[in-house]
UniProtKB/Swiss-Prot annotation:
Cysteines engaged in disulfide bonds, as pairs: 140-378
Family indicated by similarity: Belongs to the radical SAM superfamily. RlmN family.
Function: Specifically methylates position 2 of adenine 2503 in 23S rRNA and position 2 of adenine 37 in tRNAs.
Keywords: 4Fe-4S, Cytoplasm, Disulfide bond, Iron, Iron-sulfur, Metal-binding, Methyltransferase, rRNA processing, S-adenosyl-L-methionine, Transferase, tRNA processing
A molecular function GO annotation: rRNA binding
The protein's name: Probable dual-specificity RNA methyltransferase RlmN
InterPro entries: Aldolase_TIM (IPR013785), Methyltransferase_A (IPR040072), RNA_MTrfase_RlmN (IPR027492), rRNA_lsu_MTrfase_RlmN/Cfr (IPR004383), rSAM (IPR007197)
E.C. designation(s): 2.1.1.192
Upper classification of the organism: Bacteria, Bacillati, Actinomycetota, Actinomycetes, Frankiales
Length: 421
């Protein structure tokens, strides 16, 4: 089954391994499609929409400026005072249709972390998470409703894939986060969104066209986009080799995060099933090509699972793969999910793994976990059942403790990882 680009409706060709083996990217499929939205359109396309409504082309640029620069929502037409009142609603209906409906919002970490469960107009479910730190604000976005990669320790993978998200559905998650931060709806006062990580639901590179278009919208300056720095964007992948190589040629110096989780094929075949198509050596070869082309350090994601992949022998094997490379290891103590009996490595085991990598000269970070109490941490996003939408003005507060790994002293990365010194 081919993957469909929601913004165009055209099927993408499924990625293949070098030997020509097709890769199945879906477990389930829903025939849904998002409405056409301003964020799906080029400047000329959106101007054509305005003209088709009998309005001057520049009206579309005004709407885009309100959306990207002023972060005004479609249900706030009264704030768009430069648009004639009689012309506002037709323009908004055509360019800013409703894409995502909030179903539930939860907060933790003293209000510094907020998870929103969304429902699309065709009933698909997804989640995004906003996280505020002392020096930055990050949103973790979904690129698909569900995921077809089938990783057994990940709640999203256990649920299967519903459909790809459109470019606009991805961008809307980011615009919403920027709006929340600007309007002081998160603890800590007003701030600007600085980082976007494609680490929510889905495999971003399996929805390649929509994700690339979203990255371009996020980095373009208003009224074409949000004007974020590409260096503040991170795209995670389980290792779709052809797509990694293609990404290197896009001229977008985003951070590539490779979800490795094991240094050997025997174990990784079990933890990351796509490894049977592209083994570890091929995935890392593509990652090193990406680093060479972009000059960006590759983040190697590694979930520490008690008694599975956390022994020092595997730490040595991982170091052998990475020594001398433009990369760092981001260790993630496994977060609990309902469908898995695995658990995080014990603190002593985590420390031993970190020590072994550091002794080999590998830059190592340990994720400063956010959102575990509200199932918003890495690997926990599974989308709550779509029910009656509710307003998110007063998110439910759950817990307040922030997990600090090992009491380590050091700086943190834009993704919230603690650099151990």
């Amino acid at each position: 089954m081919t993957a469909t680009t929601a913004e165009s409706g055209r099927p993408d060709q499924p990625p293949t391994a070098e030997a020509g083996r097709p890769v199945r990217l879906t477990l389930t499929r829903r025939a849904g499609r998002a409405p056409r939205h301003l964020a799906d359109l080029t400047r000329q396309e959106r101007r054509d929409v305005a003209v088709s409504l009998g309005q001057p082309a520049f009206r579309a640029d005004q709407v885009a400026r309100h959306y990207y620069a002023r972060l005004i929502a479609a249900d706030e037409p009264e704030a768009m005072t430069d648009l004639p009142e009689r012309d506002r609603q037709p323009l908004l209906d055509a360019l800013l249709p409703r894409l995502l409906v909030p179903v539930r919002t939860l907060s933790c970490d003293d209000g510094l972390t907020r998870k929103t469960a969304w429902r699309t107009v065709d009933g698909a479910s997804l989640e995004s998470v906003i996280m505020r730190y002392p020096d930055r604000a990050t949103v973790c976005v979904s690129s698909q409703a569900g995921c077809g990669m089938g990783c057994p320790f990940c709640a999203t993978g256990q649920g299967g894939l519903t459909r790809n998200l459109s470019t606009a559905e991805i961008v809307e998650q980011v615009v919403h986060a920027a709006r929340v931060l600007r309007r002081r709806e998160l603890a800590g006062g007003e701030t600007r969104l600085s980082n976007v990580v494609f680490m929510g639901m889905g495999e971003p590179l399996a929805n390649y066209a929509a994700v690339i278009a979203a990255l371009r919208r996020l980095t373009a300056h208003p009224p074409e986009g949000l004007g974020l720095s590409a260096r503040g964007l991170t795209v995670s992948t389980v290792g779709l080799v052809p797509a990694i190589r293609r990404l290197a040629g896009e001229g977008l110096p985003v951070t590539l995060a490779v979800s490795l989780h094991a240094p050997d094929d025997v174990l990784r075949n079990e933890l990351v099933p796509i490894n049977t198509r592209w083994p570890v050596v091929e995935v890392l070869a593509a990652a090193w090509e990406y680093a060479e082309v972009t000059g960006r350090r590759v983040s190697v994601e590694y979930a520490l699972i008690d008694g599975v992949n956390d022994d020092v022998g595997r730490a040595d094997a991982l170091a052998d793969l990475l020594v001398g490379r433009l990369a760092h290891v981001n260790l993630i103590p496994l977060n609990p999910t309902g469908g898995s009996s695995w658990r995080a490595s014990a603190p002593a085991g985590q420390r031993a793994f970190v020590r072994r990598l550091r002794d080999r000269g590998i830059v190592t970070t340990v994720r400063d976990t956010r959102g575990r109490e509200i199932a918003a941490a890495c690997g926990q996003l599974a989308a709550e059942p779509a029910g009656k939408p509710e307003r998110t003005d007063r998110p439910e507060q759950v817990g307040s403790d922030r997990l600090v790994e090992f009491g380590a002293v050091g700086s943190t990365t834009p993704d919230g990882d603690r650099v151990l010194r």
